[in-house]
From Swiss-Prot:
Part of the 50S ribosomal subunit; contacts the 5S rRNA and probably tRNA. Forms a bridge to the 30S subunit in the 70S ribosome. One of its GO terms (molecular function) is rRNA binding. This is Large ribosomal subunit protein uL5. NCBIfam families: PRK04219.1.
Length: 182
């Protein structure tokens, strides 16, 4: 039986423990289909430079006039340099301030923007109108692929998951984000 050597690197220097930006998801939920949905699609494509997908309702809600399977919103997922670039734009628009309550226990951050016109480079177009959007930031470490792969899928151990505090530290160090109570 071969005994493995203990790691001599502290946790902060271990490359597998380094937190990284996995993806940024931008969602515009309208709750209706039609012309306004097409305008939201066009706007999201202009702002992100990526092709959005339509979100579909899961159930019928008569009071809102929504049927199951109806397209009711648009979203786009950004990864890599594109995600980082868009995230910097969004953080600049909100003044690099995030509420501590925006973070969940698994290192994800979600917040909203009331009007898209506050984003740098975005202009108001009376034909399109003004849309609000939700932004979700997903952080992960190297090795998270084991939870998504097809064969030999496994859970991420608790000690390897990104915590709320690590997510806050990552955004503070890499994006100069100030955390406010709330």
């Amino acid at each position: 039986m071969i005994k493995m050597a203990e790691s001599t690197l502290p946790l902060s220097q271990n490359p597998m423990r380094k937190v990284k930006l996995s993806k940024v998801t931008v969602n515009i939920g309208l709750g209706e289909s039609g012309d306004r949905l097409q305008k939201a699609y066009q706007l999201l494509q202009e702002l992100t430079g990526a092709k959005p997908v339509y979100t579909i309702s899961k159930k019928t809600i008569r009071e809102f006039g929504i049927r199951k399977g109806q397209e009711i919103g648009v979203k786009v997922t950004l990864r890599g340099a594109q995600a980082e670039e868009f995230l910097r734009k969004v953080l600049e628009a909100i003044g690099y301030r995030l509420k501590k309550s925006s973070f969940d226990d698994y290192g994800n951050v979600s917040f909203g923007i009331a009007e898209h016109v506050i984003l740098p480079g975005a202009r108001y177009d009376p034909e399109i109108g003004i849309f609000g959007m939700d932004i979700a930031i997903t952080l992960e470490r190297a090795g998270y692929r084991i939870s998504r792969r097809r064969r030999k899928k496994a859970k991420i151990p608790k000690r390897h998951r990104v915590t709320k505090e690590e997510a806050m530290e990552f955004l503070r160090n890499n994006f100069n984000v100030q955390l406010v109570e709330g």
